[in-house]
Amino acid sequence: TCKDAMNMKDFIKSLELSLPELEKMGEIGFAEGMSRVFVNRLNSLDITKRPIHCSDVKREIIHIKDDNKWERDNANLDRLRKIIKQLTHKNILRVDDWKKANPGCTEYNSRKNDQYLRINMEAIGPVDDGEVKRDFGKIIRRVAESTTIDKKYL
């Protein structure tokens, strides 16, 4: 069973976006970049240690462990959406680290400046309601697909 799974709060706290991952997000976009980071970190954990499981991919039935108990997310997946927002906030904080590691990125009309602007834009994520719905939907689908577990483990 998954009684030894880590709490989601601990998972979020431990997830640190690397500067190369931040650069990749600038290249491939928020939804794809966030999905990769989230899924790769989950996949690095033993399946019984993961703080999130999907029991039905088609219906996107998500179970999240926090405060040492498993709970099913609601139909709107509000908890998972909140987690994505928390991870997005961590991305934004890393942009300043990238800026410090790349002097000259604020010089107008340079390649590094173009890269810096793309990273900034993608790290922040979507702002338009339609884009938020689309991008979060993509991330949720990818997380659900990668965390599918047999119901007997829940």
PLM feature segments, named:
Residues T1-L154:
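Extended amphipathic coiled-coil helices
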